[in-house]
């Protein structure tokens, strides 16, 4: 999947064709699908005009019901109507059964300890249930867009582990759908608001969904989202608001112990009341009992706020802890993005604004913001926005390397390498006793640093003070699936290391890439000559420095005539090294090497004599 329409110099790129891709928010309570059409990003509605699909699946003897149809039967058939399946993804049956929450489902255990739902159609696992939710979303997208999808971007919570992420991918694989990328929900929300285009700053993502609350603090720097800290409560969400309202109505109506069906009916009404109070100061709750009698009560916004206030305060406390973990204050947060339908609750917005000291971003529907960000990402990944700074490449367009002595570039990852990729190379010290090494990461095809693009600099300290060339520093370049480059330098004997992250594609357009490639061709011969000269100059400096140290220590092993000849040759090497004749420098170094071979042998003999002085043969 080529994302950049790049051609070699002198050739033309193939005509651009719009590729179909969508973003999917596979949510705990509701799921959505979004796409970029004619430059506009929006969620796609179903035939009834509904954008969100309830993440509910009901299994009957003959059919599988998904979404609103399944929700209608949830009160009458809770055992076979699976809601919030996302909570089961990647978790063991033991974890689920030992948790505080009880479920109406009948479980079985798989061979590897994962939960299986017992249904009229047999045993099904959370991955299969998730696939049933994805199925109508994919069908909706292909019907609306008029063709087969090239792939999808699916969002996942930032805290999802590898097993949960793999389960999400597997759900799509069951449908034969290609997953372009799994995108963290906080990052998707930030992308939807275009925050990725800002140079730098701290962003908070306040995500209060149906089943969970997540607060993520991100630092944006040159297109790279760095997660500073995450927090929240995996058992706090809009569902809990519903449960509190349900219990309140149950107490007011003096219902006492109720069965599963009535509890589900009350819960559905509580959710309706909660949504009504978003725009109204009061509303009427009403249910019809099995005997046909009707119960009514007026619920005010003040009543609702009083019920949920302790839970909202818990979310703010989580924000405070997470900011502390991130090492930033509320005043340093540039923007707060609201995600999740429960952030529509007025009290939530009021408390968030009071805590962060500024109104949160709410112009994009909080239920849809994650799906919209995923759609923007998907559109880029299939190559529909080649000029985007958010470009996430599946191949590396320009080589990545490190600066070495003399301003030379040592390429570590070559251009057109597919990602993700990791490459490592060993470097060593230039001087005796060197305890630190500065690294300069560059991008480009030219031979000298001056002609390449500077990406980042960092320093490795704590290198053992050894002779020049004795220390071994392993430098690893790792580019992940999102095009994020991590460079790590580690001294092998001690394990000390330092690293940095950078996004090579930030601020880089197709035109700039093409220009850099053309220049590398145009100046190839000249660059090679300049590199050869620089290499010989570096070698001359290394040889002269080493020889100066040797003469200072063991110069008395030479007579005056020998010392004079060596000094003269060294002066000649130093003089030639300031010029531009690489071959002359090379020959001068070779003459100096020949001239000092006898001196090197004497030094070796002398070192052996000193080492064995005073020792008997028996001790050797």
UniProtKB/Swiss-Prot annotation:
Q: What does this protein do?
A: Chaperone involved in the maturation of iron-sulfur cluster-containing proteins. Has a low intrinsic ATPase activity which is markedly stimulated by HscB.
Coiled-coil stretches: none
Which Gene3D superfamilies does its entry note? 1.20.1270.10, 3.30.420.40, Actin, Chain A, domain 4 (3.90.640.10), Substrate Binding Domain Of DNAk, Chain A, domain 1 (2.60.34.10)
Q: Which UniProt keywords apply?
A: ATP-binding, Chaperone, Nucleotide-binding
Q: Tell me which positions the record assigns to the signal sequence.
A: none
MF GO annotations = ATP binding; ATP hydrolysis activity; ATP-dependent protein folding chaperone; unfolded protein binding
InterPro entries xrefs: ATPase_NBD, Heat_shock_70_CS, HSP70_C_sf, HSP70_peptide-bd_sf, Hsp_70_fam, ISC_FeS_clus_asmbl_HscA
Domain of life, per lineage: Bacteria
> By which gene is this protein encoded?
hscA
Name this protein carries in UniProt: Chaperone protein HscA homolog
Similarity remark: Belongs to the heat shock protein 70 family.
Share an example GO biological-process annotation for this protein.
Answer: iron-sulfur cluster assembly
- Fetch the Pfam families from UniProt: HSP70 (PF00012)
Question: What is the species listed in this Swiss-Prot or TrEMBL entry?
Answer: Shewanella putrefaciens (strain CN-32 / ATCC BAA-453)
């Amino acid at each position: 999947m080529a994302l950049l329409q790049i051609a070699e110099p002198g050739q033309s790129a193939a005509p651009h064709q719009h590729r179909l891709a969508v973003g999917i928010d596979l949510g705990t309570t509701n799921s959505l699908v979004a796409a970029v059409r004619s430059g506009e990003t929006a969620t796609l509605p179903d035939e009834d005009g509904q954008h969100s699909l309830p993440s509910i699946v009901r299994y009957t003897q003959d059919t599988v019901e998904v979404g609103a149809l399944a929700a209608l039967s949830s009160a009458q058939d809770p055992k076979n109507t699976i809601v919030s399946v996302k909570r089961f993804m990647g978790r063991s049956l033991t974890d689920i059964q030992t948790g505080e929450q009880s479920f109406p489902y009948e479980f079985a255990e798989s061979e590897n300890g994962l939960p299986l739902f017992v249904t009229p159609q047999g045993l099904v696992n959370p991955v299969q249930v998730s696939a049933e939710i994805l199925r109508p979303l994919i069908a909706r997208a292909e019907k609306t867009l008029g063709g087969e999808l090239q792939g999808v971007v699916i969002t996942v919570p930032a805290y999802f582990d590898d097993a949960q992420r793999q389960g999400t991918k597997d759900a799509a694989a069951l449908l034969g759908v290609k997953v372009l990328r799994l995108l963290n929900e906080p990052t998707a929300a930030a992308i939807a608001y275009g925050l990725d285009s800002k140079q730098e700053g701290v962003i908070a993502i306040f995500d209060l969904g149906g089943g969970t609350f997540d607060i993520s603090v991100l630092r944006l720097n040159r297109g790279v989202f760095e997660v500073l800290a995450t927090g929240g409560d995996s058992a706090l969400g809009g569902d809990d608001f519903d449960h509190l309202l349900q219990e309140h109505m149950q107490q007011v109506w003096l219902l006492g112990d109720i069965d599963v069906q009535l509890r589900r009916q009350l819960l559905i009404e509580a959710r309706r009341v909660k949504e009504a109070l978003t725009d109204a100061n009061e509303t009427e709750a009403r249910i019809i009992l099995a005997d046909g009698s009707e119960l009514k009560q007026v619920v005010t916004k003040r009543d609702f706020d009083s019920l949920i206030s302790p839970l909202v305060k818990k979310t703010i406390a989580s924000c405070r802890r997470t900011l502390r973990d991130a090492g930033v204050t509320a005043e340093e947060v540039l923007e707060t993005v609201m995600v999740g339908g429960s952030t529509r609750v007025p009290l939530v917005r009021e408390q968030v604004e009071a805590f962060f000291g500024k109104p949160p971003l709410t112009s994009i529907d909080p239920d849809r913001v994650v799906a919209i960000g995923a759609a923007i990402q998907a559109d880029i990944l299939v190559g529909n926005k080649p000029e985007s700074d958010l470009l996430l490449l599946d191949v590396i367009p320009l080589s990545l390397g490190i600066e070495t002595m003399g301003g030379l570039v040592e390429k570590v990852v070559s251009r057109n390498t597919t990602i993700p990729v990791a490459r490592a190379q060993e470097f060593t010290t230039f001087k005796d006793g060197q305890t630190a090494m500065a690294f300069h990461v560059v991008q480009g095809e030219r031979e000298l640093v001056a002609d390449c693009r500077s990406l980042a600099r960092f320093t490795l300290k704590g290198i053992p003070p050894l002779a020049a060339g004795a220390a071994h520093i392993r430098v690893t370049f790792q580019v992940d699936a999102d095009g994020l480059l991590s460079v790590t330098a580690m001294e092998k004997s001690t394990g000390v290391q330092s690293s940095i992250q950078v996004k090579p594609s930030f601020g880089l357009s197709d035109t700039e890439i093409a220009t850099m490639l053309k220049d590398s061709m145009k100046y190839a011969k000249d660059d090679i000559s300049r590199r050869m000269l620089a290499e010989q100059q570096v070698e001359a400096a290394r040889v002269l420095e080493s020889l100066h140290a040797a003469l200072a220590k063991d110069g008395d092993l030479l007579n005056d005539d020998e010392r004079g000849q060596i000094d003269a040759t060294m002066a000649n090497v130093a003089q030639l090294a300031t010029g531009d004749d690489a071959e002359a420098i090379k020959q001068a170094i070779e003459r100096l090497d020949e001239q000092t071979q006898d001196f090197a042998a004497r030094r070796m003999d002398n070192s052996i004599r000193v080492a064995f002085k005073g020792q008997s043969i028996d001790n050797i």
